Amino acid sequence: MSRATRVAERAIHRIQISRQARAALLWSIVATLALPRIPVLHTLWLPLLWLSTVAHELGHGLTALLVGGSFNRFVIRPDGSGTAFSSLPADANVLDALVSAGGLVGPAIVAATWFILARRPLGARVGLALFGGAFVAAAALVADPGFTQIYLGSVGGLALVAAALLSAGWAQGALVFLAVQMSLSVYTRSDYLFTEVAAPSGAPSDVANMAHALGGPYWAWGLACGLFSALVLVLGLRWYIGASGKLSLRDLRS
């Protein structure tokens, strides 16, 4: 086989992978927006609902660690609610606000990272492996025993298997699917953004905590977090779609 033929085959293969990944992006967005609104398919939406709750609660806990506090444990429940238990220094209003914001914007930051990794097959495998490893570690270290541990361990294990066994195009598609879930989680759970009281606990919501610590109306902080997540989603999509349609010399090198 001549070098020109090998280069042509690599180019065709790369284009096929890009098309698969773009199709996965489109169907991921459609599924995320449609499943909760179709009664017959509502059961299929539940695992995605739980995933958004995990992302939200881990965002709180990891932010607490980043600002010098502790992340004790977290729990998610079959109805989609969840709670993260963390500790901060006394009278740390600003830190409290940051921890509250972490649950709202943290998933969008993770999504942007995954969109960047999904531009290349190897990056997609690395992203899936990191995701799976993080969920397995969270299940072992900070997840509440029972439903939370089972869900995190199962999803994390599946992600590790996917990283090892999926073809290049499917690995990219899987990571893009997860990135879309993270990006849209703050919108599919609009109760996170524009309510003063968290349901069903009746405690102040994250945006109410931010308003108490930093001033201003709670809905303004919800709007700010929502716009930040939207910006990350748009930038991630532009970066991903632009890169997936280009061929580099590295892609064609034998």
Label each residue range with its predicted role.
Residues 2-34, 42, 79-244, 252-254:
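Metalloprotease/metallohydrolase-associated module, dominated by Zn2+-dependent proteases
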Residues 39-96:
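Small-residue-rich helix-interface/hinge motifs
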Residues 249:
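Active-site rim/adjacent substrate-binding subdomains
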